[in-house]
A protein has these predicted regions:
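Pocket-flanking alpha-helical
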Residues: 1-14, 122-126
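A conserved helix-loop-strand patch within extracytoplasmic ligand-binding domains
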Residues: 14-70
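Short beta-strand->loop
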Residues: 17-25, 97, 113, 123-142
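A bilobed periplasmic-binding-protein/Venus flytrap-type ligand-binding module shared by bacterial periplasmic
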Residues: 28-39, 146-159
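Short amphipathic alpha-helical coupling segments at ligand-binding clamshell hinges
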Residues: 44-46, 157-168
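A local structural motif
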Residues: 44-45, 69-98
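Ligand-binding clefts/hinges and TM-proximal coupling segments of bilobed small-molecule sensing domains
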Residues: 51-79, 163-191
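Short helices/loops that flank or line small-molecule/ion binding pockets
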Residues: 62-63, 84-120
Length: 191
């Protein structure tokens, strides 16, 4: 997604820079069941696993705030880099467990709830809009910011093969595949 690309480009040499050429779909981050199966079961001190990388951790904490479970400092946005130490209100005294995003699906047996990003959810057959207890909305700021992209080296941005790939990726078949996976296409079908 775009924030990840920005972070990547900030850390690599000019020769390694990449640019976005095709916008594909949004994979919502969601709060999933761990040892508890509904949000109505939430209790004092429950553990919630969140990704520990700066971009996804802030996004996960915003998701928990939007779900009404915590409060972050006023003015917190997707560009902020909040961590659990920034939580200003935690009515259930939740224990926020920071883990590598790829490990969270497998850690659900050890926590009450888990915040999992879309690509890691699909690896364990979780569909956000079906299995998520609380899901980022398809029309949210997160959906605009975290749209998945195809990237290339700048010199390839206008290459014919990129145009051909976009034409193939923006078909009705791909659109339907994305929807059936529980994600939100961010393109209109090419005519």
């Amino acid at each position: 997604h775009v924030p990840y690309l920005a972070g990547y480009n900030a850390e690599v040499s000019e020769e390694e820079q990449l640019v976005a050429v095709i916008y594909t779909h949004f994979e919502p981050m969601a709060l999933y069941a761990g040892t508890k199966t509904t949000l109505e079961e939430i209790a004092e001190g429950d553990k919630i696993a969140v990704p520990n990388d700066p971009v996804n951790e802030n996004r996960a904490l915003l998701l928990l705030q939007n779900a009404g479970l915590i409060k972050l400092p006023e003015g917190t946005t997707l560009e902020s880099q909040c961590t659990p130490s920034d939580i200003v209100e935690n009515q259930y005294n939740l224990d926020i467990v920071e883990l590598n995003a790829e490990l969270i699906p497998g850690a659900r047996a050890d926590v009450a709830y888990a915040v999992i990003n879309g690509n890691n959810a699909t690896l364990v057959n979780l569909i956000p809009n079906k299995d998520g207890l609380y899901v980022e909305a398809a029309d949210s700021e997160a959906a605009k910011a975290y749209v998945n992209i195809v990237v290339v080296k700048p010199e390839n941005a206008d290459a014919q093969w990129v145009k051909d790939l976009q034409k193939v990726m923006h078909t009705q078949e791909v659109y339907d595949l994305i929807v059936n996976a529980g994600f939100a296409p961010t393109f209109t079908v090419a005519q």
